[in-house]
Design a protein with these regions (language model features):
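Non-catalytic positions within long, well-ordered alpha-helices that form the structural scaffold/packing
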Residues: 7-8, 70, 106
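Glycine-rich, proline-tolerant flexible connector loops at the mouths of alpha/beta enzymes
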Residues: 12-36, 143-144
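Glycine/small-residue-rich loop that forms an oxyanion/phosphate-binding "nest" at active or ligand-binding sites
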Residues: 55-75, 79, 83-88
Length: 187
């Protein structure tokens, strides 16, 4: 319902995470993603961006589970490059998994939204582009102010922008009170 309301308010893209209907906890369940995608596609032409984050997964099959949303043929899927300390744990994105995920997205015809949380993540994304795993132009999401990633400041935003590949299309996000200042400066 929130994605459809956002589209009705003028959003061109919706980024989707799903939650357990009983507990409200973040989950990576293909059936829930499928239900959300179906409901959105029934009434709108909004661009659908499904997450592949899986930071909450504690499963030996997590790497494969994270890529299940590709089965739904979304327009876009997030591709988190690099690992990050996050919410009392580690948001693990090995170089091998990132490369495999980029390849799977390319084969599926899904545009990756390359989420970068620190400067080193831009280096890894550039490697993926140079290796032909991500088509040019790439779309980079500069994620600022996420705990233990790069701080949400104008200086950080400018430095991230400076290091992007020349052809990159980019956008930015930041949590809570940092969102408006970061998106304003991004314009």
């Amino acid at each position: 319902a929130e994605a459809i309301a956002a589209w009705q308010a003028g959003a061109a893209i919706v980024h989707i995470h799903v939650r357990d209907p009983q507990t409200g906890a973040p989950v990576t369940r293909l059936d829930l993603f499928a239900e959300v995608v179906e409901r959105i596609r029934e009434v709108s032409d909004v661009i659908i961006n499904l997450t592949t984050s899986g930071f909450h997964l504690d499963d030996p099959q997590a790497d494969e589970i994270r890529l299940q949303p590709l089965e739904l043929a979304p327009d876009i899927c997030s591709l988190d490059v690099g690992s990050l300390n996050f919410r009392g744990g580690v948001f693990h994105n090995s170089a091998e998994w990132v490369e495999a995920a980029a390849q799977r997205m390319r084969e599926a015809g899904v545009k990756p939204e390359i989420e970068v949380f620190d400067l080193g993540h831009i280096r890894q994304a550039t490697h993926l582009i140079d290796a032909g795993l991500i088509d040019d132009p790439p779309w980079m999401q500069l994620c600022l102010g996420i705990p233990w990633g790069i701080e949400a400041s104008v200086g950080s935003l400018l430095e991230m922008q400076r290091r992007l590949p020349a052809s990159a299309r980019w956008s930015t996000l930041a949590p809570a009170a940092s969102q408006l200042p970061m998106t304003t400066h991004a314009l």
